[in-house]
Amino acid sequence: MLASGNDAAVAIAEHISGSVDAFVELMNEEAIAMGATCTHFDNPHGMPSETHYTSAYDLYVIFKNAIENEKFVEIIHTSTYTATITNVNGVARERSWDNSNRFITGRTDTPDGFTIIGGKTGTTGEAGYCLVMLSENSLGQPIVSIVLKADGRSNLYLLTREILQEFNN
């Protein structure tokens, strides 16, 4: 979740449902149960395909459900995670993953009056630069912001800042 892990998404899918196809079916059922009716998953990792799509509203619905889970919020709020990995020969090494959300890592300034809780970035050629994010304004009100199809990373954060500032007046 900090940085996209397509291999991990496939491993989780196979572990939970026995196969990617069975997991994707479960994802689609869950999306409909949440009310995300303009979404169809074709894989567990979000890579493009003709039958893999969603809408900004459905992303909001899915994200709103996800942030009810405290562990999810903890993960999306994490700047860097370091794990010790041991290979089959017993040799251990550390591996770190950085959050791809530049507001969380401090590589982009947080808008005045906001606390960034966390979010998830995504980037593909077709979708452009995307960010779904939870923050709080100066009144402590939670704000979910969604930017899709930004034409560059810096523009993604500029658009997100502009959206957030509309909620701090």
Language model feature labels by segment:
Residues 2-15, 42:
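Substrate-binding clefts and substrate-entry loops adjacent to catalytic sites
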Residues 1-2, 20:
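Generic alpha-helical segment signature
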Residues 18-169:
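Penicillin-recognizing serine hydrolase domain
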